[in-house]
Amino acid sequence: MTDAAAFWQQYLSTLPATHPHHNAIYEAWGFGDSAEMADELGQLVLAGTKTATASAVKEYEADGERIPPVGDISIILDGQNRPLCIIETTEITIKPLNKVDAQFAWDEGEGDRTVAWWLAAHERFFRRLYEKHGWTYSADMPTVFERFKVIYTAS
């Protein structure tokens, strides 16, 4: 059993037998594109500072994955693929990257939490992603703006 699967079973053991999460399908993943970023952003989630994330619609399409719906469950991993917590998606909005608003930038919990900082950091991140795939980056690229809440931590 993987660490994530064991963590999931630990979470389920805290729930009543009739809870719908006993039948839920989860994904396990870390934030960002490096172990360091997964560690840093995972800690922001654990601290309650980070309650939102953004991802490229194009990446979901290229990977043949669905955009997470409200109610989606994920195990958040650190940079060594160890489980940190379980989150539940509470809101999904799709709009151009450069249409981020101040509240979302704040909720992402990164840097100084301003729109200017958020846009600069996410442009760097998405330029790396797009370059890796041979795609052409655009500031108005369709983006999944996701809000979530932590529903379980080990401690």
Regions found by a protein language model. Name each.
Residues M1-I86, K95-S155:
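Mixed-charge, low-complexity intrinsically disordered regions
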